[in-house]
Regions:
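PLP-dependent class I/II
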Residues: 1-14, 23-29, 33, 37-55, ...
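A short acidic, glycine-rich active-site loop
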Residues: 59-63, 291
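Conserved N-terminal alpha-helix of the aminotransferase class I/II PLP-enzyme fold
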Residues: 63-97
Length: 392
């Protein structure tokens, strides 16, 4: 059979992940130091693991309600009000298999063929392909290093057309670590209030901000909750990536439609993970603070080390990534990262994997031990010196 003729054109056109390529290459190098994975190096807090174990011992292994356990949805509402001044009821919450499923459901529920979806770049890799699979048209906005990769109101205003349906608002940002201040979020909201454009606010890194830059959800601002779907989850803040649990909150009519799609393709999120997540929301504020403090220590070290060796790097205020310029090499970001991997066995991700505006940069995760980071920084410095790009 000619499977190429049978496959859906939109699915065939999907590009493979530029991140996965480097994971696969690094897997064959036993001494490779990887700074590529966007995953906490901490274990899930014991109280959360214990809650999952207890749920299994009690025989809680059946499906839950499609939207998720009622107790978990209540706890999510309480948590969002306590932490981010967001006010929701159970009917506004859908528990999903990770934040990525919530993003997929939101885009599929909202976007029709020909609708434009504004996506600030550089950005997480899933927004564009999901939009394209629905027949939507991605409209990219290239954020700039001089703005610390934050979306500006002027950029947004210029990108909106009569066909614009949705803005993806991914802050704190992967891959840049950019955080929007309260004033900057309000400027974006002011533009949107003049339109019928909806917002998909990806807030998976909302607990991971540093210094005075506490995360401000755009849905907390006047007139914005009614047009915003907030996506969040447990993977990053609670070190629960393998538990595969996220959620979406938003206007009940939108969440209801997303739940119908979720019911058809997933049924319900993992039951054990949901019981564990209730404990995470109840008991893990101290563990979040501990992990955040440690990320902050690593962040300061990596930013200082990169700048000292000549890889210009602004100070990110969120997530657990830095996004240094590699332009002193004269190489593309893919060439730079491939050479570094081959010659020094250090895996980082080319900025171009996160969109065209990421060219000339690379993403480095600091979700690793300080010893791991120090070894990687030493190898990167040696790599730069051996090629004559720096003299230090």
């Amino acid at each position: 059979m000619n499977y190429d003729e049978l496959l859906a054109p939109a699915a065939k056109a999907m590009r493979p992940s530029g991140i996965r390529k480097f994971f696969d290459l690094a897997a064959d190098m036993p001494h490779c130091i990887s700074l590529g994975v966007g995953e906490p190096d901490f274990k899930t807090p014991w109280s959360v693991r214990d809650a999952g174990i207890r749920s299994l011992e009690l025989g809680r292994t059946k499906y839950t309600a499609n939207a998720g356990l009622k107790d978990l949805r209540k706890e999510i509402c309480t948590y969002l009000q306590r932490r981010f001044e967001l006010h929701y009821q159970e009917e506004n919450v859908l528990v999903t298999v990770g934040g990525s499923e919530a993003i997929d459901l939101a885009i599929r529920a909202l976007v029709q063929p020909g609708d434009e979806v504004i996506i600030p770049e550089p950005c997480f890799v899933c927004y564009e392909p999901i939009t394209q699979l629905t027949g939507g048209v991605p409209v990219h906005i290239a954020t700039r290093a001089e703005d610390q990769f934050r979306l500006t109101a002027d950029q947004l205003r210029a990108a909106i057309t009569p066909k614009t349906k949705l803005l993806i608002f991914p802050y704190p940002n992967n891959p840049t670590g950019a955080v929007m201040s309260a004033a900057e979020v309000e400027e974006i909201a002011a533009v949107l209030r003049e339109t019928n454009v909806l917002v998909l606010s990806d807030e998976i890194y909302s607990e991971l901000t540093y210094g005075l830059d506490r995360h401000v959800s755009i849905a907390s601002l006047p007139g914005m909750a009614e047009r915003t779907i907030v996506v969040n989850g447990f993977s990053k803040s609670y070190a629960m990536t393998g538990w595969r649990l996220g959620y979406a909150v938003g206007p009940a009519p939108l969440i209801k439609v997303m739940t119908k799609i979720h019911q058809s393709c997933i049924m319900s999120a993992p039951t054990t993970s949901q019981y564990a997540a209730i404990t995470a929301l109840h008991q893990c504020d101290d563990q979040i603070e501990m992990m955040r403090d440690e990320y902050n220590r690593r962040r300061r070290y990596v930013v200082k080390a990169l700048n000292e060796m000549g890889l210009t790097c602004f100070e990110p205020r969120g997530a657990f990534y830095v996004f240094p310029s590699i332009q002193i090499s004269g190489l593309t970001s893919s060439e730079f990262c491939e050479q570094l991997l081959r010659e020094k066995e250090v895996a980082i991700i080319p900025g171009s994997a996160f969109g065209a505006s990421g060219e000339g940069y690379a993403r480095i995760s600091y979700a690793y031990s300080v010893d791991h980071l120090q070894t990687a920084m030493k190898r990167i410095r040696e790599f730069l010196k051996e090629h004559g790009w720096i003299q230090k």
